[in-house]
């Protein structure tokens, strides 16, 4: 294995024996939620993956070592620290040589999962094309990594703060299938009403696993996006959500928040908005994605 990577013994055993494994990102722990809710949520996500038959592998960088699978102490430490870097692909070598701790974004998690052979990854929502990207060129690295690596990404669509239409256009250009799990409408993270179509709809985890297997055994490159709608009891009314997002974006512009700081800032603004329950919704959709990802990983391990 890569000299810079430490794989948790349980994860390593699963990979060597062909057992199902689900990769999990760590940005949500360090930058997505306040402590202690972040640690509690991350531990519950791992539990949900296990309860549905797969081995969880939370990915992060701890003191310059890339970790695939965290122990509870490492996970708690990551949730408590205030100086944890937000690590995308370009930041990994810097974080390693400086022996820093870093929380991996969707793109970095996909990259590391692919390095060690994990084929399924659960997250809240993927990054994508930001609003006003025509002027700012702010497009998440997540989309490139999804298009290049053979990993299935289970998410509640793309984060609601993004331009969802352009995000889907970008994925289409890159040849990435967007599979709606039991839906033909692309979910909008906190809401299921985007008015946009997925590439295909599949209703069974086994069908998604078969599509992954077929695509990659045909020699086709790249991953797939499994768009899994937020459970209805956690969904936020679209009009209320749109107002909250507009307010958050305006605040970001006023405070000149850009680049890698933008998404955490916008999500923080949504979580603090008293008119919506975005933190509870975020947790609900992540739990749901972890369950579906585990079911897909189990089915894929049978092929």
Swiss-Prot record:
Its cofactor is Mn(2+). It is an enzyme of class 4 (lyase). Pfam families: Indigoidine_A. GO terms for cellular component: cytoplasm. Binds 1 Mn(2+) ion per subunit. Its EC number is 4.2.1.70. GO terms for molecular function: hydrolase activity, acting on glycosyl bonds; metal ion binding; pseudouridylate synthase activity. One of its GO terms (biological process) is nucleobase catabolic process. It comes from the Bacteria. Substrate binds at residues 86, 106, 140-142. Belongs to the pseudouridine-5'-phosphate glycosidase family. HAMAP family: PsiMP_glycosidase (MF_01876). Catalyzes the reversible cleavage of pseudouridine 5'-phosphate (PsiMP) to ribose 5-phosphate and uracil. Functions biologically in the cleavage direction, as part of a pseudouridine degradation pathway. This is Pseudouridine-5'-phosphate glycosidase. It comes from Acholeplasma laidlawii (strain PG-8A).
């Amino acid at each position: 294995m890569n000299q810079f990577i430490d794989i948790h013994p349980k994860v390593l055993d699963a990979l060597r024996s062909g057992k199902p494994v689900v990769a999990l990102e760590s940005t949500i722990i360090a930058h997505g939620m306040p402590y202690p809710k972040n640690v509690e949520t991350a531990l519950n996500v791992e539990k949900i993956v296990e309860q549905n038959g797969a081995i969880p592998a939370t990915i992060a960088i701890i003191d310059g070592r890339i970790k695939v699978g965290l122990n509870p102490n490492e996970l708690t430490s990551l949730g408590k620290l205030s100086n944890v870097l937000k690590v995308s692909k370009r930041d990994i070598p810097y974080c390693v040589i400086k022996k820093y701790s870093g929380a991996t974004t969707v793109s970095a998690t996909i990259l590391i999962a692919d390095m060690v052979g994990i084929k399924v990854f659960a997250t809240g929502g993927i990054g994508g094309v930001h609003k006003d990207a025509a002027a700012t060129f702010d497009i998440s690295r997540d989309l490139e990594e999804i298009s290049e690596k053979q990993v299935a990404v289970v998410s509640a669509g793309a984060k609601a703060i993004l331009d969802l239409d352009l995000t889907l256009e970008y994925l289409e250009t890159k040849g990435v299938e967007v599979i709606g799990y039991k839906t033909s409408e692309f979910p909008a993270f906190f809401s299921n009403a985007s008015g946009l179509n997925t590439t295909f709809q599949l209703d069974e985890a086994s069908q998604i696993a078969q599509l992954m297997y077929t695509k990659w055994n045909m020699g086709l490159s790249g991953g797939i996006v499994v768009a899994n709608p937020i459970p209805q009891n956690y969904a936020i009314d679209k009009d209320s959500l749109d107002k909250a997002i507009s307010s958050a974006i305006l605040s970001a512009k006023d405070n000149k928040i850009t680049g890698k700081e933008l998404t955490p800032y916008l999500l923080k603004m949504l979580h603090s908005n008293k008119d919506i329950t975005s933190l509870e919704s975020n947790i609900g959709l992540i739990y749901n994605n972890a369950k579906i990802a585990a079911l897909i990983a189990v089915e894929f391990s049978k092929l």
